[in-house]
């Protein structure tokens, strides 16, 4: 089962804990995106599917959306290694990686974000510091956590060589 918890960082609809660097024109300076599903529903679905031993895959780009999945998994009564997967995990923080490791949540990074939207993330979406942390594969490796990387076709072409290059080099188009 795939739950979609938020939107995209490049569209400024990912659900964040800190405001966007430059919010959309129609939003205030405190705009942080928004969840697509309330926490209560996320927790209910994770618990129900865990009881049925059905793995959960959750689209979570923003760190606030990641918090929602972490909370739901923590509160669920997971009797087995459930292999919950967090799709995209673009802005997960260090403390979230620690919790994900503890709860065995596997991140699957959309790591070509650095190539396709890195400049936009730096200059408009997150600012320099947060943009440098997009898809934190090094932090994940340092924790000896399993993770995967993926393209999100048709959002970007299904080019595995560019995906691996982007994951290791983290260079923008410019």
Segment roles from a protein language model:
Residues 91-174:
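Active-site-adjacent C-terminal substructures of enzyme catalytic domains
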Residues 1-63, 99-106, 111-112, 164-166:
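Metal-coordinating catalytic core of metallo-dependent amide/deamination hydrolases
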Residues 76-85, 92-96:
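Long amphipathic alpha-helical scaffold regions
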Residues 36, 87, 127-128:
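Residue-level marker of alpha-helix boundaries and capping positions
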Residues 48-57, 77-83, 143-147:
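Short, surface-exposed connector motifs at secondary-structure boundaries
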Residues 57-61, 85-90:
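Catalytic beta/alpha-barrel core
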Residues 66-77:
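Distinct, well-ordered alpha-helical segments
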Residues 31-33, 82-84, 122-125:
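Short, contiguous strand/loop micro-motifs
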């Amino acid at each position: 089962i795939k739950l979609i918890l938020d939107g995209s960082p490049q569209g400024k609809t990912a659900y964040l804990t800190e405001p966007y660097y430059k919010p959309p024109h129609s939003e205030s300076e405190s705009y942080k995106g928004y969840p697509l599903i309330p926490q209560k529903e996320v927790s209910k679905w994770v618990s129900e599917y865990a009881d049925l031993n059905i793995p959960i895959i959750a689209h979570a780009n923003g760190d606030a959306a990641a918090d929602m999945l972490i909370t739901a998994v923590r509160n669920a009564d997971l009797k087995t290694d459930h292999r919950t997967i967090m799709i995209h995990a673009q802005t997960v923080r260090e403390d979230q990686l620690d919790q994900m490791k503890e709860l065995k949540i596997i991140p699957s990074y959309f790591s070509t974000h650095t190539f396709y939207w890195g400049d936009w993330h730096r200059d408009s979406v997150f600012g320099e510091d947060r943009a440098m942390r997009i898809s934190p594969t090094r932090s994940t490796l340092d924790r000896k956590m399993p993770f995967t990387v993926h393209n999100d076709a048709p959002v970007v072409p299904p080019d595995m060589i560019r995906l691996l290059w982007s994951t290791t080099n983290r260079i923008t188009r410019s």
